[in-house]
Amino acid sequence: ILHTGAGKDLNAAKQPVVFEKNGQKVALIGATRVIPEAGWAATNGHPGMLSSYEVSVEPLLQQIASCHADGEKVVVLIHWGIERDEKPQEYQRALAKRYIDAGADLVIGSHPHVLQGIEYYKGKPIFYSLGNFVFGSSIPKTMLVQAAFTGESLSLQLIPGTSSGGYTRMLTDAESKTQFYQYLEGISFGVSVGEDGIVSPQP
C-alpha cells in the first residue's frame, strides 16, 4: 500500500506519493499537526510522522516547494484541528496559507471527525475537514471531493454523504443534497457550492 507522511526517518516521512496521468504529475504529501507524544515525530535517524507544528513545519514546506519546482501539482493531506469542532482553528488557516505560499495546489484536512468549511487562498482551495470516511461513531454529514487537474485549472465536485455504524452512504435525493450544500456554504469562507456539487470561489 502506497503511503506518505511517515517513515523510518524524516527524509522518508516527507517523501510524496506521485501519480502521473495524461502527462500530469500529482504529488500527495501527508503530514500531521496533532501528535500526542513528541517521540512520534520523525527526525533524522528516528522513525515517525511528518510534523507540521509551527516549529517543525520547514521540512514539509521544503518538500512542497521541491515538488512544485519539479512541475508537479501538489496536494497536502494534513491531520489537524479540534475533534467535533466545525470551525477551523486560526492556526489551521495560517498553516494552509503557508502550504499554498510554498507551492501547494490543494489542501485537504482531516482529524476533526466533522465537516469544516472550505476556503480559497490565492485561487487555491482548502478543505479544512471532510468529516469521516469510515469510522465507528455516527456523524450526520460527511463528504468526498473529486479533484481533477487539467493543465493549470482544478475542478472540484463534492460527493455528500452520511456516516453511521461504520458505514458511509451517499446522499441520493435532491433535497438532502441541496440542504447539505447550503450548510457547507454557511460554514465556509466565500465559497459557492452549486446544485451539482461544483465548488467555486464567490465572485
Cite the ranges covered by each PLM segment.
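Acidic, metal/ion-coordinating pockets
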Residues: 1-203
